[in-house]
């Protein structure tokens, strides 16, 4: 697997290079309890990182969900962990991503219908089959100026990743077919 430093799309100036900032993997369980624990264990096994519990924003009586109840698990991966998981996730979707999966800020989200589609994962009847969402955030150097707490400042539009740049990154650097 390539290092996260090697997966960069260089476009002239060094401050215009595009890289993978983070990958967020989410499993929406829809209920707490044993199902949530199974999903958390699976996510930890797949990514090697400790998942965080995601709570319901509001109560939905028809689904039996109360506000504040944990109903999902997610994990944020950065650097080499993010690249390794992203490569496996792209293999699970046959290196194809829809053009509508890209937003205007350089974020890409796609779903995996069953976790057993990931390479090297076998079916375990005790865990079951889970689908997951994979979200990739692309960035350019200097974006931290806008996100940090102290001495926060605005960043020019050239420092934001556009939809076209994100598509170009996925096609040229990752070898993904965008439909």
Swiss-Prot record:
Highest taxon of the lineage: Archaea
GO biological process, one term: translation
Keyword set includes Heme: no
SUPFAM superfamilies: RL5-like (SSF55282)
Molecular function via GO: RNA binding; rRNA binding; structural constituent of ribosome; tRNA binding
Gene Ontology CC terms, in alphabetical order: cytosolic large ribosomal subunit
Gene3D superfamilies attached to this UniProt entry: 3.30.1440.10
Keywords for this protein: Ribonucleoprotein, Ribosomal protein, RNA-binding, rRNA-binding, tRNA-binding
Pfam families: Ribosomal_L5, Ribosomal_L5_C
InterPro entries the record matches: Ribosomal_uL5 (IPR002132), Ribosomal_uL5_arc (IPR022804), Ribosomal_uL5_C (IPR031309), Ribosomal_uL5_dom_sf (IPR022803), Ribosomal_uL5_N (IPR031310)
Annotated function: This is one of the proteins that bind and probably mediate the attachment of the 5S RNA into the large ribosomal subunit, where it forms part of the central protuberance. In the 70S ribosome it contacts protein S13 of the 30S subunit (bridge B1b), connecting the 2 subunits; this bridge is implicated in subunit movement. May contact the P site tRNA; the 5S rRNA and some of its associated proteins might help stabilize positioning of ribosome-bound tRNAs.
HAMAP family according to UniProt: Ribosomal_uL5_A (MF_01333_A)
Subunit structure: Part of the 50S ribosomal subunit; contacts the 5S rRNA and probably tRNA. Forms a bridge to the 30S subunit in the 70S ribosome.
Protein family membership: Belongs to the universal ribosomal protein uL5 family.
Protein name: Large ribosomal subunit protein uL5
Species this chain originates from: Pyrobaculum aerophilum (strain ATCC 51768 / DSM 7523 / JCM 9630 / CIP 104966 / NBRC 100827 / IM2)
Gene: rpl5
């Amino acid at each position: 697997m390539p290092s996260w430093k090697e997966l960069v799309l260089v476009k002239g100036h060094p401050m215009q290079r595009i890289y993978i900032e983070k990958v967020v993997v989410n499993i929406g369980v829809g209920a707490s309890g044993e199902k949530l624990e199974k999903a958390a264990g699976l996510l930890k096994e797949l990514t090697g990182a400790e998942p965080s519990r995601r709570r319901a924003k509001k109560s939905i009586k028809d689904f039996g969900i109360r506000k504040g109840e944990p109903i999902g698990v997610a994990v944020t991966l950065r650097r080499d962990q993010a690249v390794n998981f992203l490569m496996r996730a792209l293999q699970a979707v046959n290196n194809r991503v829809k053009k509508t999966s890209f937003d205007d800020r350089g974020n890409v989200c796609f779903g995996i219908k069953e976790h057993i589609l990931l390479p090297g994962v076998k079916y375990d009847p005790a865990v079951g089959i889970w689908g997951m969402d994979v979200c990739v955030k692309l960035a350019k150097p200097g974006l931290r100026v806008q996100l940090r707490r102290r001495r926060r400042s605005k960043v020019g539009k050239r420092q934001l990743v556009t939809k076209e740049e994100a598509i170009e990154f996925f096609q040229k650097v990752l070898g993904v077919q965008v439909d």
